[in-house]
Regions:
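Phosphate/diphosphate ligand-binding glycine-rich loop within oxidoreductases
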Residues: 44-116
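Rossmann-like adenosine-cofactor binding region
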Residues: 54-58, 152-222
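Structural motif
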Residues: 5-9, 29-31, 48-51, 70, ...
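N-terminal glycine-/charge-rich "phosphate-binding" loop or analogous flexible N-terminal tail
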Residues: 1-43
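Glycine-rich adenosine-cofactor-binding loop
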Residues: 7, 93, 119-140
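Short, charged/polar "capping" segments at the starts of alpha-helices
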Residues: 10-15, 35-37, 74-76, 154-156, ...
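NAD(P)-binding Rossmann-fold cofactor-contacting core
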Residues: 141-156
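Phosphate-coordination loops involved in phosphoryl transfer and adenosine-cofactor binding
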Residues: 64, 119-123, 195
Length: 222
């Protein structure tokens, strides 16, 4: 089997050596800035990070059938690739959940320390996946009141989030579907919200940044 691997995926070489008969693999490492269609023409499996955009142009006439991403989420895949049954696609869902939650909690702690917010204020969580669930669990352990909104799971209401002084965003990004998240936080949301701080560790496109700039809200993004 011919493997095409991003050379910045940590520990990949070490893990491959632990696989029985690993010497049967034909391996080529690539720099994510230089990956082209020609590279994919001689590979059966592709291992990437979120820095690689996977689309029809990249995979045209390629024998690749397996794609593994060392990051969570599918934002770097074009929909026509995701919907093509030719490809088996795997992502590392939740792999960075702890790191993201630690960053969010650090932001909240700093805001409390600087007296931008008080510790007993209500927090809102948008998106109840791996990160949202872990954040909620820790907030419960810290006795910090919070509300959750995830329309796909039928949890909460967006209007409830408007009452929260701090909103932390962990939703997946989409422009289509039953509940598109593109510019979910916009002038309509902000106009009726008592929110003072928005922490966005998800995709930037979930925020209408012009609306944020025209508001008094403190916006934190990683």
């Amino acid at each position: 089997m011919r493997l095409l691997i991003d050379n910045k995926i940590p520990f990949f070489r070490e893990y491959l050596k632990k696989i029985k008969n690993h010497d049967q693999f034909i391996i080529k490492y690539f720099d994510d800035n230089n990956l082209e269609n020609d590279d994919c023409l001689n590979a059966d499996a592709l291992f990437i990070r979120s820095t690689t955009r996977v689309n029809s142009e990249l995979l045209s006439n390629s024998p690749i059938k397996f794609i593994g991403s060392a990051t969570s989420g599918y934002d770097h895949f074009d929909n026509n690739i995701l919907n093509n049954s030719k490809y088996s696609i795997y992502v590392a869902s939740g792999c960075n959940a702890s790191a993201v939650v630690n960053w969010v909690l650090s932001c909240i702690g700093l805001l409390v320390f600087k007296k931008v917010i008080s510790r007993n204020r209500m927090l809102g969580i948008i998106g109840y996946g791996n990160v949202g669930k872990l954040l909620s669990k820790i907030l419960k352990n810290l006795n910090i009141d919070h509300k959750i909104y995830d329309p796909y799971l039928g949890i909460g209401n967006i209007n409830d989030i408007k009452d929260c002084e701090v909103v932390s965003i962990h939703a997946s990004y989409s422009k289509t579907g039953k509940f598109p998240s593109h510019e979910l936080i916009n002038s309509d949301f902000l106009g009726g919200a008592s929110t003072k701080v928005i922490i966005n560790s998800a995709r930037g496109e979930i925020i209408d940044e012009d609306s944020i700039l025209n508001s008094d809200i403190l916006y934190l993004s990683d």
